[in-house]
């Protein structure tokens, strides 16, 4: 029985083995014990500070603050980020259980990120069924310098990205199996992702677009039946996610105004506010500074061909 189970799960075991080997190759096992540093170290420190302040100052969820005294005329650190600080609060709870160690923050962020890569493998496995390509394509994403660097960092972006991947896995299962429970699981995961980083709402917007196209009869996603069967619960769940995240952003704006905090940005910086020269400058920055940090040129060519 054990041998049969191992044969059935050998693709998962092989992938996890490769994932562990690559993680060690990237020195994840050593980096976990480092404090915030290098690129984006100021925002890393902000996140670490938010978690530590919860731990030190009473676990008041709606009173986030940092150690940087930029609020209330330079007398407090009360400042609220645009993301819902559930992640930082949970880190503070772990500090309560195990004591304050920065490695806890990095370790949790790393585990969530690697879980996201694992679910990316599951997505490929679900659709391709080919073991080699499922493993290879999932690990290919793990060659991105940007993902590798932020994957075990103090920023919540990588965790948000991971929860989005997991959410899409369950949405695909909903689409293929017509099981509504998978839709609601995916919505819960997208909520967690958007709570960690508001840009994760794009996943919800994409699904809302699918819903709109189907109910208006512009297209059909399921054979012989509608993909979105419920006319109330499905749109209500998507609206609820946007409402929860939007409500927090409004609260964050109010909280920051109340305490005179301008440290965190709780607004948008749309492209239409830029001049033509500024837009060209951004595109030049992407081409000259960042493009190869996303993926090696050979990978970009491969993805373009695909």
Per-segment meaning from a language model:
Residues 104-128, 165-170, 306:
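Transmembrane-helix motifs of polytopic, lipid-linked glycan transferases
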Residues 10-44, 49-52, 58-59, 239-255:
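Transmembrane signal-anchor helices characteristic of membrane glycosylation enzymes that use polyprenol
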Residues 46-54, 192, 204-221, 225-306:
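Transmembrane-lumen/periplasm boundary regions of multi-pass, lipid-linked membrane glycan transferases
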Residues 149-160:
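Short acidic/glycine- and proline-prone juxtamembrane loop motifs at membrane-interface regions
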Residues 125-132, 167-183, 193:
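Membrane-interface transmembrane helices that cradle and orient dolichyl/undecaprenyl
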Residues 75, 138, 183-198, 204-209:
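Membrane-interface alpha helices of multi-pass inner-membrane proteins
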Residues 26-50, 58-70, 78-90, 100-103, ...:
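Extracytoplasmic catalytic/substrate-binding loops of multi-pass membrane glycan-assembly enzymes
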Residues 100-103, 120-143, 161-162, 181:
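Transmembrane-helix signature of polytopic, membrane-embedded enzymes
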């Amino acid at each position: 029985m054990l041998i049969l189970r191992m044969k059935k799960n050998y693709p998962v075991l092989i992938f996890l083995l490769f994932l562990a080997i690559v993680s060690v190759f990237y020195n994840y096992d050593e980096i976990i014990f480092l404090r915030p540093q290098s690129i984006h170290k100021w925002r890393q420190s902000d996140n670490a500070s938010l978690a530590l302040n919860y731990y030190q100052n009473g676990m008041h969820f709606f009173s986030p603050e940092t150690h940087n005294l930029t609020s209330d005329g330079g007398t407090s650190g009360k400042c609220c980020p645009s993301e819902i600080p559930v992640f930082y609060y949970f880190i503070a709870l772990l500090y309560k259980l195990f004591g304050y160690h920065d490695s806890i923050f990095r370790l949790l962020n790393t585990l969530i990120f690697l879980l996201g890569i694992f679910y990316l493998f599951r997505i490929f496995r679900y659709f391709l069924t080919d073991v080699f390509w499922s493993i290879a394509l999932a690990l290919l994403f793990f060659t991105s310098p940007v993902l590798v660097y932020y994957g075990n960092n103090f920023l919540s972006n990588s965790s948000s990205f991971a929860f989005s991947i997991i959410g899409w896995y369950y949405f695909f299962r909903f689409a293929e199996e017509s099981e509504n429970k998978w839709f609601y699981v995916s919505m819960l995961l997208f909520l967690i992702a958007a709570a960690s980083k508001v840009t994760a709402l794009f996943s919800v917007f994409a699904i809302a677009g699918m819903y709109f196209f189907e109910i208006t009869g512009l297209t059909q996603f399921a054979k012989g039946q509608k993909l979105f069967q419920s006319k109330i619960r499905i749109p209500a769940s998507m609206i609820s996610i946007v409402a929860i995240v939007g409500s927090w952003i409004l609260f964050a704006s109010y909280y920051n105004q109340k305490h005179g905090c301008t440290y965190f940005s709780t607004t948008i910086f749309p492209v239409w506010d830029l001049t033509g020269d500024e837009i060209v400058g951004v595109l030049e920055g992407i081409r000259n500074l960042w493009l190869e940090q996303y993926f090696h040129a050979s990978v970009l060519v491969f993805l373009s061909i695909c």
